[in-house]
């Protein structure tokens, strides 16, 4: 595997493009508007600059990594790559449409991966004629720092596809751990109910955010409290994942907190909107 395309130049997409280029892959980062890819490239350049400043990589290596990244607003530029990693918003119809298009554009042996954090890989694969070569590659945010890639096998994902993607993730310096397709996979099936429970304790007046987060940080050795983490992830994303769990597992223990729904409706999404459980 020599070349990778990343669909989406946002926070996750540009992070994936960066770590792939730093690992020696030739990368094409694709989005629907030139301004989006320009913003993504600017983010990568800033990130590489910080790594050089911290002496975690040389200027020569940073320049080489940047040179391996090209950009495009045409998905047909993915036609010759070995692996595509999709990193667009968590909307099944959008992902299915992109995978259907990529299935027609990409060479038959190309692997199509999704960075989805909760959407069924098997459902995404149904939009293609290569379900054995469709897989989940759930990178964690921020991608250049976090060491895990959660690999999700769909119902028809082949062992060869899994092995190839695990090897690619490891080449990027990540630990790749695999699971089978299920709502929320492992990471968010366990994490998001905890975040939701923290929101419920706030909703019920049990404690204020500083106390809730402080108890989990100091008492449970969490590096960040659940409410601050919810703000970092985005409250709209947390709500989406809770809805996926609630509907997919058909269990009311996954019902999202009313406070979470209210805050999302009010546009209080966390860091990205400037206000969530904290102000930024």
Where are these regions (language model features)?
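Rossmann-like NAD(P)-binding element
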Residues: 36, 50-111, 119
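Rossmann-fold dinucleotide-binding core
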Residues: 111-180, 188-189
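NAD(P)-dependent Rossmann-like dehydrogenase/reductase catalytic/cofactor-binding core
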Residues: 2, 23-25, 159, 163, ...
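Acidic/polar active-site rim loop that often engages polyanionic ligands
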Residues: 25, 79, 142-152, 223-224, ...
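Structural motif
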Residues: 7, 30, 72, 87, ...
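NAD(P)+-binding Rossmann beta1-loop-alpha1 motif at the extreme N-terminus of oxidoreductases
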Residues: 1-50, 54
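Short glycine/serine/threonine-rich phosphate/pyrophosphate-binding segments
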Residues: 13-15, 95, 117-121
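Amphipathic alpha-helical segments at domain termini/boundaries
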Residues: 21, 29, 65-83, 167-173, ...
